[in-house]
Amino acid sequence: MNRASLEKDPHEVASMFDGVARRYDLTNTVLSLGQDRFWRRATREALQLSPSDKVLDLAAGTAVSTVELAGSGAWCVAADFSVGMLAAGAARDVPKVAGDATRLPFADGVFDAVTISFGLRNVVDHSAGLREMARVTRPGGRLVVCEFSTPTNKLFATVYKEYLMRALPAMASAVSSNPDAYVYLAESIRAWPDQAELAARIEAAGWSDVRWRNLTGGIVALHAATKA
């Protein structure tokens, strides 16, 4: 996959993440200026989990996000297409499953809640992925998508765009084993739909009561929805 290409082959995406797995968590903390911890906590709070819940954390990577969710007392499973990422998180004591977001290895309606953080952009057919998330969620179950989005302030949006295309790749070169992956990250964020468009796509995939909340000035948005 050319680093500038947003035409994603799933195996190439998995290979790209395999290549950055070892230093992935450190790189994310550095490049987000420590905001990644806040975003994970906000995702857990948005899910409103109880100890009886069964939760799918999709595109969980090294399972840092899954451990955060499990802090609620809910039973949580980490799923990711990158075996390398799951292996990098092997020490984290949560169940882990390798799987494709568009063909999940779970029965219908088995989860009370499904979440995906910073992974929907990397799903080849994200509409199919959203439908598959609905399939494995029980009626009345919840979805929370935590994803990069569009800053709401125009001046801030301009500064952020400069950071994405100039500073972020330079910083990634210093801390990541594969800085080209972060050029792809920047370009995929720029190409991603804004808050309202993503909400429409989530609704079109069969979810109801779709709403969103901006974090960090709209750099990230939490989209929540319910399965009818």
Swiss-Prot record:
Record-annotated membrane-spanning stretches: none
One BP term from GO: menaquinone biosynthetic process
Molecular function as annotated in GO: demethylmenaquinone methyltransferase activity
Stored Gene3D superfamilies: Vaccinia Virus protein VP39
Reaction(s) this enzyme catalyzes, per UniProt: a 2-demethylmenaquinol + S-adenosyl-L-methionine = a menaquinol + S-adenosyl-L-homocysteine + H(+)
Pfam families listed in its UniProt record: Ubie_methyltran
Keyword S-adenosyl-L-methionine: yes
Binding site for S-adenosyl-L-methionine: 62, 80, 100-101, 117
EC number: 2.1.1.163
Keywords: Menaquinone biosynthesis, Methyltransferase, S-adenosyl-L-methionine, Transferase
Tree of life domain: Bacteria
InterPro entries named among the record's database cross-references: SAM-dependent_MTases_sf, UbiE/COQ5_MeTrFase, UbiE/COQ5_MeTrFase_CS
Pathway info: Quinol/quinone metabolism; menaquinone biosynthesis; menaquinol from 1,4-dihydroxy-2-naphthoate: step 2/2
Family designation: Belongs to the class I-like SAM-binding methyltransferase superfamily. MenG/UbiE family.
PANTHER family assigned to the protein according to its UniProt record, in alphabetical order: 2-METHOXY-6-POLYPRENYL-1,4-BENZOQUINOL METHYLASE, MITOCHONDRIAL (PTHR43591:SF24), METHYLTRANSFERASE (PTHR43591)
Function, in words: Methyltransferase required for the conversion of demethylmenaquinol (DMKH2) to menaquinol (MKH2).
Name this polypeptide is given: Demethylmenaquinone methyltransferase
